C-alpha cells in the first residue's frame, strides 16, 4: 500500500458537503491534509449576517470532526481585481460573462495554489466533479466527472497543465448521491447542507438589484428585427441572448401566438431586439469566433481539428471543427446552434477529455455577424 503520509494536500473548503467529503476521503487515504477556507467576497446580507462567517463555522466543525488543521485566507482584493472587474467590464461591453471560469483560473487554482505552496503543499484539492489522469509521459489529462449531471470541466477549462499537475479531484469518480451518503455515514456537520446556487459572489441575491449597485442601467427601446417598437427595456446588461422571461411583453403576440425571446442587442443604439419562437432565425448561427484560446495540455500554435464542444454549461455536446490561430479560433458547427452568447465560454472535448476552450466573441450566420452586442 502506498504511504501517503508524507504527501501534503491542501483542500479548498467552502463549508459545503463536496469539499467536506473531499477532505475526509484524502484523510482516509492517509494524506497529510490541511483545510483552507477562502474568503473572496464581503457578503454581509441585508440583515447584517455574513454568510462567510457561517460557512467558516461549518469548515471548522468538519475539520475538527475529521482531525485536520484549518486556516482562513482572505482573497477579496485578488477576487475584485482579477474576477469582479472583468465581470463588470464584460457587462459594460454588452456581453454575458461567466465569472466561475475566471474564478477557477485566477483564484481557486492561482491565488489559492500559491498560498497552499507556502504551507508546503504537494497538491491542492477541491470538491469539483472532474477527474485528472496522468499518462506515461507525465502529462495530466482532465476528464469529465463520472456524474454527468454534475460534471464541472466546463468551468475548469482555462486551467493550465502546470495547475493540473498540482491538483487532485477526489470526487471525480463519484456520483453526487454517493458523496451525500459518505457525508451522512461519517456524520459530517455539512451532510444535509443544501448546495449553493447562483454566481459565487452574488449567491441568492436578486441579480438585477446587485448589478445596478455597480453599473448604471440605461433604459432603451425594445424592437423586433423588422422595426416594431415593443416598449422599453430596463438596460441591456440585464438581458442575455435567448432569454425568455422578464421581457414584460407576454400578452403581445403575433399571429403565431409563440413566446417572446431576446434575439439580439445593439450596444451602440441601446436597442434590445426581441422575436417570437424558441428557434427564431435571428437566434441561429453556424460558426463563432473565440479568443483567450487555451488548452489544458501542449498543442501546436496553429492547427485545425474536429471535436465536440459545449457553448454553455449543462448543454449536450455538439460536433464542431476548430481552426486555431494562436490565442484565437474559429469554431464551425456541424449543425446550426441556438443563442451563441458573447462572453460565455466555448469548451472543447475529445470523448471524456476536456481539451480547453476560450471566450466567445461573436457568432456568425452564413459568414455575417449576428447582432448580439
Curated annotation (Swiss-Prot):
<keyword id="KW-0067">ATP-binding</keyword>
<feature type="binding site">
    <location>
        <position position="127"/>
    </location>
    <ligand>
        <name>ATP</name>
    </ligand>
</feature>
<dbReference type="Pfam" id="PF20258">
    <property type="entry name" value="tRNA_Me_trans_C"/>
</dbReference>
<dbReference type="GO" id="GO:0002143">
    <property type="term" value="P:tRNA wobble position uridine thiolation"/>
</dbReference>
<comment type="similarity">
    <text>Belongs to the MnmA/TRMU family.</text>
</comment>
<dbReference type="InterPro" id="IPR014729">
    <property type="entry name" value="Rossmann-like_a/b/a_fold"/>
</dbReference>
<feature type="region of interest" description="Interaction with target base in tRNA">
    <location>
        <begin position="98"/>
        <end position="100"/>
    </location>
</feature>
<keyword id="KW-0963">Cytoplasm</keyword>
<feature type="disulfide bond" description="Alternate">
    <location>
        <begin position="103"/>
        <end position="200"/>
    </location>
</feature>
<feature type="binding site">
    <location>
        <begin position="12"/>
        <end position="19"/>
    </location>
    <ligand>
        <name>ATP</name>
    </ligand>
</feature>
<keyword id="KW-0694">RNA-binding</keyword>
<feature type="binding site">
    <location>
        <position position="38"/>
    </location>
    <ligand>
        <name>ATP</name>
    </ligand>
</feature>
<dbReference type="Pfam" id="PF03054">
    <property type="entry name" value="tRNA_Me_trans"/>
</dbReference>
<feature type="active site" description="Cysteine persulfide intermediate">
    <location>
        <position position="200"/>
    </location>
</feature>
<feature type="site" description="Interaction with tRNA">
    <location>
        <position position="344"/>
    </location>
</feature>
<protein>
    <recommendedName>
        <fullName>tRNA-specific 2-thiouridylase MnmA</fullName>
        <ecNumber>2.8.1.13</ecNumber>
    </recommendedName>
</protein>
<keyword id="KW-1015">Disulfide bond</keyword>
<dbReference type="GO" id="GO:0005524">
    <property type="term" value="F:ATP binding"/>
</dbReference>
<dbReference type="GO" id="GO:0103016">
    <property type="term" value="F:tRNA-uridine 2-sulfurtransferase activity"/>
</dbReference>
<keyword id="KW-0819">tRNA processing</keyword>
<keyword id="KW-0808">Transferase</keyword>
<feature type="region of interest" description="Interaction with tRNA">
    <location>
        <begin position="312"/>
        <end position="313"/>
    </location>
</feature>
<feature type="region of interest" description="Interaction with tRNA">
    <location>
        <begin position="150"/>
        <end position="152"/>
    </location>
</feature>
<dbReference type="GO" id="GO:0000049">
    <property type="term" value="F:tRNA binding"/>
</dbReference>
<dbReference type="InterPro" id="IPR046885">
    <property type="entry name" value="MnmA-like_C"/>
</dbReference>
<keyword id="KW-0820">tRNA-binding</keyword>
<feature type="site" description="Interaction with tRNA">
    <location>
        <position position="128"/>
    </location>
</feature>
<keyword id="KW-0547">Nucleotide-binding</keyword>
<dbReference type="InterPro" id="IPR004506">
    <property type="entry name" value="MnmA-like"/>
</dbReference>
<dbReference type="InterPro" id="IPR046884">
    <property type="entry name" value="MnmA-like_central"/>
</dbReference>
<dbReference type="InterPro" id="IPR023382">
    <property type="entry name" value="MnmA-like_central_sf"/>
</dbReference>
<comment type="function">
    <text>Catalyzes the 2-thiolation of uridine at the wobble position (U34) of tRNA, leading to the formation of s(2)U34.</text>
</comment>
<dbReference type="Pfam" id="PF20259">
    <property type="entry name" value="tRNA_Me_trans_M"/>
</dbReference>
<feature type="active site" description="Nucleophile">
    <location>
        <position position="103"/>
    </location>
</feature>
<dbReference type="GO" id="GO:0005737">
    <property type="term" value="C:cytoplasm"/>
</dbReference>
